[in-house]
């Protein structure tokens, strides 16, 4: 957890996620933030568009943390919720695999295919939703051999990543092409939209020490 040291009058930022990738993005932006795990079970309702699933989950995560914080502090709190859903061109959602065999199956299906990642962002301040956004990223995987897939899954263990690979790490070795306006959205958090939203909220931001 990052200890929030924002100047009096600034907002306290709270990330409603234990995702190391999202924490790394915020840390790289020199934002000071706290981390609180959400009490929310991600939904995957049949028939619901993937972009909507991502938004529902982000709202649920941020909302659960905002409810925890309600009445606990006089600070101006902004809760950041985010989720990511991956689907194939045919519309099949590739959920977090949860097992090695399922990850191998997903990557086998996705080999030489275009995938779309929907990364959502929800900001809740003092109980009110201030921003709700979904960013899409297109990724083309190389034609992968069975050996490449099994070796990658064993080495990188992407069992809790949508699409069964870590694009911010060794998963890049599986990729042929990326189309996105914000690479951070592919990594799990639409950072450009987040920063724009914070500016629009007239928040001066609390920067971590530059040293």
Predicted regions and their residues:
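Anionic-ligand binding patches
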Residues: 2-13, 47-211
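N-terminal beta1-alpha1 ligand-phosphate binding loop
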Residues: 2-31
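Cofactor-binding loop segments of dinucleotide-utilizing enzymes, especially the Rossmann-like FAD-
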Residues: 18, 38, 126
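Surface-exposed, flexible loop/turn segments at secondary-structure boundaries
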Residues: 21, 41-43, 129
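Short loop/helix-cap segments at secondary-structure boundaries that form the rim of catalytic
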Residues: 24-28, 45-46, 72
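A generic short alpha-helical patch detector that favors 3-5-residue windows
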Residues: 31-32, 166
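A short beta-strand-loop structural module common to alpha/beta enzyme folds
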Residues: 34-42
